[in-house]
C-alpha cells in the first residue's frame, strides 16, 4: 500500500509502516482480510493487515530520500531504539494509529527535536483532545488525521472516517494554528478534498482512492 500526501506542487509518497522487527505474511494477510464492505457511509475497504512488513532496516534501505518513511512501535522501548536507528535527516511518519500499537502508544519527544523536513504523527480517528494536546506539547507540529476506524473485523477506511477527521482538524486549528494538518479519509474527488481544505487542513492524503489511480490526477491538480 502506498499513501500519498498531496501538496500544491505534486505528491509526496508515504511508505507502508515499518516496525523494529520483521512481521512477515503481508500478502497472505491482504488476501485473507482485505474486503470491500458496506457501511452506513457507503461501500469501503476493510483490512486487518497487522502491520506486516520486512522490518526497519529494509525500510531504511528502500525508502527514497524524497519520501516519508512510516514507522510504528510495538514494544515499550521501540521508539527509543527506532530513534537511534533511523537517519536523522530522514523524513518520518510516526504511526500511533493502528490497533496493534494501542498497548504502547507513548511517544518520545526525541524525533521532534531533529531538523527533519517531515516529522509527522499519524493519529487514529478516535483520538481524544487530551491526547492531541500531549502530542503537540511534545513538540510535534505535523499531524496526519486519520487512520482507519477500528472494528472487530478490521479497520474501515474511506468516507466513514470523514466526521472524525473534520473534528480533529477543527480542534487543532482552533487551539494550535501553527500545527500543519494532513487530512485523509474518503478523499475520492475534488469536492471531498476541498471539504478538508476548507475546514483548515494544510495538506491532503490519499489512501483507498489509490486503488483507482485514474482518479488521483484529478484530485491533485
Map each language-model feature to its residues.
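Catalytic cores of alpha/beta
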Residues: 2-6, 79-86, 126-138, 172-176, ...
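Glycine-rich tight-turn/loop motif centered on a GG-T
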Residues: 31-50, 100-113, 152-163
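Glycine-rich phosphate-binding active-site loops on the catalytic face of alpha/beta enzymes
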Residues: 15-21, 94-98, 142-152, 187, ...
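Hydrophobic faces of well-ordered beta-strands that scaffold small-molecule active sites
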Residues: 11-16, 67-71, 92-94, 119-123, ...
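Alpha-helix-loop-beta-strand connector modules within alpha/beta enzyme cores
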Residues: 53-66, 106-125, 156-183, 219-221
